[in-house]
Regions:
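Short, surface-exposed coil-to-beta transition loops
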Residues: 26, 112-113, 284
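Beta-rich carbohydrate-recognition and catalytic domains
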Residues: 1-24, 33-108, 120-220, 230-282, ...
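Short, charged beta->alpha transition segments
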Residues: 106, 113-116
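Well-ordered alpha/beta subsegment
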Residues: 276-277, 289-297
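Conserved beta-strand position repeated once per blade in WD40 beta-propeller domains
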Residues: 28-30, 115-117, 177-179, 225-227, ...
């Protein structure tokens, strides 16, 4: 299913996120509506772009159907973050680069805070993503990055950063794509099958496992994903699943698809839609969701080089919920 087509046919809207910036590509936007009603989006900007040969893949790059294109003299994959404010028509009003604290010298080739989800907890704004540049092996941990937003001058600065450990033992290689629960401060869905809920304590810098229980058993790993946002008596989120493989020439390739997840108030996964695409591209990624006037705003990117907001009509969301609640593996 092409979700954009269905949404637009039912009165929804697809809006690109476009603004001037210092790097090469805009990707993986995370939308959030704050306590004051402002529609905010954190957008990842990178110094590279992704080329992916689509459809029948008649025009691969010299390196295969999927290739990262970056400066020849700097093969690092660098990320910066921008904060954008939209009006209700989903047009860009303001944008600015997030000024990050200079706390360390990056020592791995993935540089910066990647795929950050935007939330407001305890009246503080956070962008929460993975950072992999603090060790020579590229170990990844989610980081809780507190930002201060001056809405008069439209400037944004990082004011505090916590590197979030996993529940003991904190020995895994790469943690990423935890899904923040929008109205439960410092709580995340770490895994979807079984559902693992974890809570980080900023005061003592530790993470505990809140619960671990099996809900629906997806036939593919469901990975984050957007925030969990309130919808009726429960929550909705978007997860992704991916097939990573090599083609007949042993060149790497991949296909990403998404699903709508339905959660009850106890954070049980009770519904899972059929897989869908946004725009029928093979490489797509959704990291943001927000409710606006009964509709669901979804922020996503295509091929790591263009960012969009999809206003999904509430009637279509309800259709997807019915489908999800009737999930059969």
């Amino acid at each position: 299913m092409n979700l954009v087509q269905r949404a637009v046919e039912q009165g929804g809207k697809l809006a690109p996120i476009v603004f001037t910036h210092d790097l090469t590509a805009l990707m993986n936007p995370s939308i959030y509506i704050d306590n004051g009603g402002d529609i905010l989006v954190n957008v990842r900007a990178t110094n590279y772009t992704l080329y992916h040969s689509e459809n029948k893949q008649l025009f691969p790059s010299p390196w295969g159907p999927l290739a990262y294109l970056h400066p020849e003299k700097d093969q690092r994959l660098i990320t910066e973050n921008y904060l954008v404010r939209l009006d209700k028509n989903l047009e860009v009003i303001n944008h600015t680069k997030v000024e990050m604290l200079n706390l360390h010298t990056p020592i791995w080739e993935f540089v910066g805070l990647e795929d950050a989800r935007l939330v407001q907890w305890d009246n503080k704004y956070y962008i929460i993503g993975v950072r992999r540049d603090t060790t020579t092996s590229g170990q990844g941990r989610m980081e809780l990055t507190q930002i201060d937003i001056d809405k008069e001058t439209w400037t944004v600065k990082e004011v505090n950063r916590d590197r979030i450990p996993t529940p003991e033992p904190d020995t895994s290689y790469c943690e990423k794509n935890w899904m923040p629960i929008a109205d439960r401060p410092y709580n995340f869905i770490k895994w979807a099958s079984p559902v693992e809920v974890v809570q980080y304590s900023p005061e003592i810098k530790t993470t505990k496992q809140v619960s671990l229980k099996q809900g629906i058993r997806p036939n593919k790993d469901q990975r984050g994903g957007s925030q969990l946002v309130r919808w009726g008596d429960g929550y909705l989120s978007i997860t992704h699943e991916v097939d990573l493989f090599k083609n007949y020439l042993m060149q790497k390739d991949g296909i990403y698809r998404h699903r709508l997840c339905v959660w009850n108030n106890n954070l049980d996964l009770v519904g899972l839609s059929k897989p869908f695409s946004f725009l029928d591209a093979r490489i797509e990624f959704c990291v943001g969701a927000a409710e606006l006037d009964g509709d669901l705003l979804l922020s996503f990117s295509v091929s790591d080089n263009c960012a969009f907001i999809l206003r999904t009509p509430g009637i279509l969301v309800e259709e997807l919920i019915v489908e999800a609640l009737n999930y059969e593996n």
